[in-house]
Amino acid sequence: FINNNKQMKKNVIAIILARGGSKTIKNKNLKKINNKPLIGWTIDQCKRSKFISQIWLSSDSQSILNYGIKKKINIIKRPLKFATDKASSESAWMHAVKHLEEKKIKFDTIVAPQATSPIRGKSDFDDAIKVFFSKKYDSLFSCSVIKDFFVWKKIKKRLIPNYNYRNRKPRQLIDPLLLEN
């Protein structure tokens, strides 16, 4: 990405996390959606970006890593401790960053697309990268707006609403919630 104000070249890379041990949908990252593995959609979208210079795939699954090799992207073998149900995405990203630093891979900015959110427009990555640099943000994420819903959460066997139950607004007047994609 070239920032027109400073003529400074930015090295933007993508780190895609795709673990193999999903318990909900077995091998979900390799399940075909419209004749393409789920992970393939995100890889191809990153490849179409004008600004992403390198794509790195982090996984504990050799099958997923082999797919990355087939797609001609860089791979990082993720240790199992960063690939459990309880491991955070942040711990896996930090492992990937450490791997890149050890390999002396230079980058300024990381795009961290979710493989499980494959429905993106052709220019979504590039549009987001442009906004990120032009607004001088330190981070940026996409989200979906949830409107017209009463949301509850369960805390120690109690249900807690997202509204004041003594003054329940009509659903049309509820402030929208933002759900990170």
Model-identified regions with their sequence ranges:
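Conserved core of the sugar-phosphate nucleotidyltransferase
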Residues: S91, H95, T109, A115-N181
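Conserved acidic residues
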Residues: V12-I13, S53, D108, D138-L140
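Histidine-centered beta-alpha loop that forms part of the nucleotide-sugar donor binding/catalytic region
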Residues: R19, L80, Q114, S144-V145
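Asparagine-rich low-complexity intrinsically disordered tracts
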Residues: F1-K10, K70-K72, E102, K130, ...
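Short phosphate-binding loop-to-helix
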Residues: W56, Q62-V111, I119-S123, D127
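Short internal beta-strands
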Residues: I55-S59, S142-C143
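A short, N-terminal amphipathic alpha-helix
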Residues: L38-Q54, N66-Y67
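N-terminal nucleotide-binding beta1-loop-alpha1 segment
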Residues: M8-K26
